[in-house]
Amino acid sequence: MYKRQLPKHIIDFLKFTFEVVYSNNIHVIAAVFTFGREDLIPDMFIQIIKNLKIDTEKELSDIIYYFERHIEVDSDEHGPLALEMIQQLCGNDSEKWEEALKYSKKALQLRIGLWDGIMTNKKNKLSFA
């Protein structure tokens, strides 16, 4: 399934994602989803919007609207619900909290690797243009 046509940072990210999903550990899946995605995306999108609005707001009004809407929904609804879900799933079980922490950290590391790889690929393409 994981062939050479995809860069390593993408393969690593996808492989981990599917390992988590197929683990069937609902508290781990919820933690990775919450802390590896939902909890960080609003802040990430805010930074993207700030950079997009500098020169190109008219050209990118639809994507800016998408980001702003995503920030609103994640910040006001999804984020708090996801945190509540983690609390309910892990409860007072310290082992579940440890697993949630371990897998959330790995998810964040792999997401950073994914974005770093994307930036490197983009810079390499620009340097050859």
Predicted feature residues:
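Non-heme di-metal
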Residues: 3-129
